[in-house]
Amino acid sequence: MEWTVWEGSWRRDGQGPGEFREVIQIGIIKLTDTADMEETEDIQILIRPVLNPELSEYFINLTGITQSQVDEQGLPMPEALATMQTFLKPGMPTIYSNGVDGNILDENCQKIGIPFPFAPDKFADIHSNLDDFLNVHPRDLVSSRLPETMGFSPPGHAHDAIADCRCIAEALRIMRRAGSF
């Protein structure tokens, strides 16, 4: 998942004036629950921000997502969440992320006054699994850096939601082969 950021906001943990972490891009891939964790489907959703409608130059340079893409292709958050729910289907198991994506989505829903459509336990943060496996501080476990940290080829552009999902998936595969996931 990608959300609004500004120069220096990482160091400020997104707590600077006007720096609400508004979700702009959601990527989801489905994996088989087998030894090889094969990818079966994917979806990427652009979201039109409400609170921070103008993307920062820093965000654009970091993600490659342009203002015109968001303006023309971005969905309102309620529609994006409905698309996400349809893709996940009822009964879909846990959503793994490298961080607190579920919390950030919930914060976004609260901030714009819409219901969060997922159970609190739907999202699982793999930070602690990666930290235990790699013995790396969680702050250094950015999804787009996993290829370098774990020794695999990047599956796409850094800070692209689908590419980050594929980084997480490959990290999980490596951990599974090592008997750690």
PLM features: what roles do these ranges have?
Residues M1-W10, G14:
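Short acidic, Gly/Ser-rich segments with clustered Asp/Glu that frequently serve as metal-coordination loops
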Residues G14-F20:
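Short consensus segments that form the blades of beta-propeller domains
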Residues P17, V70-Q73, V136, A158:
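Alpha-helix initiation/capping motif
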Residues R21-T63, Q85-F181:
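Metal-dependent phosphoesterase core characteristic of DEDDh/y 3'-5' exonuclease domains
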Residues I60-A80:
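Metal-dependent phosphoesterase signature
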